[in-house]
């Protein structure tokens, strides 16, 4: 049976993934997840894939569970969503600090409601995901992570092998990375983000400038992450002064508190946001879902179409900067 990772890699190579729906930091809240999947026209109200959905990748940037009280039913939902994805679709689950700290607690002998098979499922998920020119990560990219990525690219000419290599080093062995503080830094769990990027190296170059240079060497110009909310709204062009030349998008709007939150990335790299404010401005739930499904081609006509410019402005970055 082909795994979610294998299916995803094959689709990526074929270049058939048209849209990517990005979820972040849902913390056990299946209502928020199901609601977004329904709004986008990918699933029914119960979270089951709709017939006819094609060429979508769902990426969760981590913290799909709560580290203190992980719900088995939340894990089972994502497991089923991943395994039941249509042939031209895939589900990428990245581990966040909640999943990593949960594994750390289990490794130290603390019991959890999750079974051994469910814990094994967590350990099968990736730390990061690269698609075209976009890096998907739980938190913020660090120099150490990007230097490793660049080394793999220089040795093998591609980054597809990196996820497997890092997953092995991250979860396996006596000195597995997930057990250490470095493991959290690897997924971008930086405690003082601006201070980190403003720090100067031995050569005097600021960390943020070096991170920007490494990302550009990797062919990455956009980073989409979760982990830290910005006034309960997604934030586009975050840290543009600290990490020049890189578009950083914070997708964490605390969906478990606001009711919904996601980003949709099309094949050109254009990003649209799903959140309560955009829904309100565009006329409420029914009108909003109709417009989103029209853009994504998941409506009744199954054909993507353009929206008027003023509607696109609400879904795009302009609306986010006003929040």
Segments and roles (model prediction):
Residues 11-21, 128-136:
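Beta-strand-turn-beta hairpins that frame and shape the catalytic cleft
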Residues 94, 102-132, 136:
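Extended active-site neighborhood of metal-dependent phosphoesterases/phosphodiesterases
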Residues 236-323:
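Binuclear metal-dependent phosphoesterase catalytic core
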Residues 36-112:
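Core catalytic region of metal-dependent phosphoesterases/phosphodiesterases
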Residues 29-30, 66-69, 98-104, 143-144, ...:
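Active-site environment of divalent metal-dependent phosphoester hydrolases
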